[in-house]
Design a protein with these regions (language model features):
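Amphipathic alpha-helical interface segments
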Residues: 80, 84-153, 157, 169
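Preference for long, well-ordered alpha-helical segments
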Residues: 122, 129-132, 144-204, 210-211
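Transmembrane signal-anchor/signal-peptide helices with a preference for the extracytoplasmic
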Residues: 41-53
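Conserved phosphate/anionic-ligand binding catalytic regions in large, soluble enzymes, centered on
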Residues: 17-40, 144-162
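Short, hydrophobic/aliphatic alpha-helical segments
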Residues: 3-22
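Long, charge-rich low-complexity segments
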Residues: 79-94, 197-211
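Amphipathic alpha-helix face/heptad-repeat signature
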Residues: 30-34, 62, 69-76, 111, ...
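A structural-propensity feature for long, helix-poor, extended segments
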Residues: 50-89, 189
Length: 211
């Protein structure tokens, strides 16, 4: 059964187990998926409201975009765990002869590169979610300000959690060019995503405090 098909209780029990996977990477993807789901919710709560009739098309489009992000982030949960299992298998390869050592080293290198892709994808998806949220500031149902804020925090957690996974995987690579490229890509997403998250959270905190 894929991780996204588990119950909430079942998934948290898997995380809490002694097994190293699923772990932080899949949890980061789930955090992002929750943020995307809340974005879809906030957009949905804006639809059909006379007060927001001028932004109905925007809300409908945002709802669809957020739900698409949610599904892709749920898929990333499984992808992260599967690539981790791949590199774990590489570390378990025999290393008695020079040939075995070379084969093991090569498999580990390829496995670590593969492990870098899901968290980078999660960062990209969370960045898209934060961009979508920012476009909705002041245009969604005001009664859902706290939900909007939690969406922002969840997407931020997903992005920064995935970044930690990018860093730990690239830190073990011998291919420094690949590692530098992956880190540069992740840093670029942080540089645009985190200020967006700060703006969205500050506005929602102010909105909630005014009530």
């Amino acid at each position: 059964m894929e991780l996204a098909e588990l119950t909430v209780r079942g998934f948290t029990e898997e995380i809490a187990s002694a097994s190293p996977a699923p772990g932080g990477g899949s949890a980061a993807a789930l955090a992002g998926a929750v943020g995307a789901a809340l974005t879809a919710m906030v957009s949905g709560l804006t639809l059909g409201r006379k007060k927001y009739e001028a932004v109905q098309e925007l809300a409908l489009r945002a709802q669809a975009q957020a739900d698409a992000l949610r599904k892709r982030l749920l898929a990333a949960m499984e992808q992260d765990t599967q690539t981790f299992l791949q590199v774990s298998a590489a570390y378990a390869m025999p290393k008695q002869t020079p040939e075995e050592k070379q084969a093991r080293s090569s498999a580990i290198e390829q496995g670590l590169k593969a492990c870098t892709q899901p968290p980078l994808a999660v960062m990209q998806l969370c960045a898209e979610g934060l961009e979508l949220l920012e476009s909705l500031l002041g245009k969604t149902n005001a009664t859902a300000a706290s939900d909007f804020g939690v969406a922002c925090l969840s997407l931020r957690a997903g992005m920064q959690g995935a970044w930690l996974n990018v860093c730990i995987n690239t830190g073990s690579l011998h291919d420094t060019v690949f590692a530098a490229g992956a880190r540069a890509a992740g840093q670029k997403l942080l540089d645009t995503g985190l200020p967006r998250a700060d703006r969205c959270y500050a506005e929602m905190l102010a909105a909630c405090s005014e009530k």
